[in-house]
Amino acid sequence: MKNKILDLRAYFIAGPQDFPKLSIDDAIDKISVIIKSGVTVYQFRDKGTIYKNKNQRLEVAKRLQEVAQKAAVSFIVNDDVELARELSADGIHVGQDDDSVSKIRELIGQEMWVGLSVSNDMELESAQKSGADYLGIGPIYPTNSKSDAAEPIGVDHLRKMLEHNQLPTVGIGGITENSLTELSKIGLGGVAVISLLTESENYKNMVQKIKQNIR
């Protein structure tokens, strides 16, 4: 909610589909451990997850929201306005193909944060006046975490985009431990990651490395 400070530094995105070899319950346990490892934002993104019914999805989201709340981690819902409203989430994140930010504002009011994905200069320019609270720019590097990802923009182009940007921003897409250093020097408010954490052998150490580089 907007009465809290939105700390974007270590922005974790995941759903049960990001642990394909695990049951939904075991995936929730893994995600919960990562949420409690020091991340600052958790985005519930469950595209590709097969649930028994709508109620099971709601229960999964509620369980993860409760973990985030207890850990003082901001809880963001990906795309789904209805779910964000039902949970009274801290915010919602949408893409260019979803409803406009102004339309979403009509549905959720002013209390939730709205994040918007941006992948090129034209979208960035439009986003400045969209009413979004923060942006996710990328993909920066090639990524396997999203099958519908746009072409990578690269660090140099991202740096130029940030020169024309007035909104808090996370970089996203293909971020590895080795790329954190170069991303620390271009003015990002945070990095949004999936596999960097889901595939990590030590979640707390990886989150600490993110925070050491993105300040």
From Swiss-Prot:
Keywords: Magnesium, Metal-binding, Thiamine biosynthesis, Transferase
Protein name: Thiamine-phosphate synthase
Gene name per UniProt: thiE
SUPFAM superfamilies found in the cross-reference section: Thiamin phosphate synthase
Single GO BP term: thiamine biosynthetic process
NCBIfam families from the UniProt entry: thiE
Pfam families for this protein: TMP-TENI (PF02581)
Organismal lineage: Bacteria, Bacillati, Bacillota, Bacilli, Lactobacillales
Residues engaged in binding 4-amino-2-methyl-5-(diphosphooxymethyl)pyrimidine: Q43, F44, R45, D46, K47, N78, S117, K146
GO molecular function: magnesium ion binding; thiamine-phosphate diphosphorylase activity
Residues involved in 2-[(2R,5Z)-2-carboxy-4-methylthiazol-5(2H)-ylidene]ethyl phosphate binding: T143, N144, S145, G174, I194, S195
GO terms for cellular component: cytoplasm
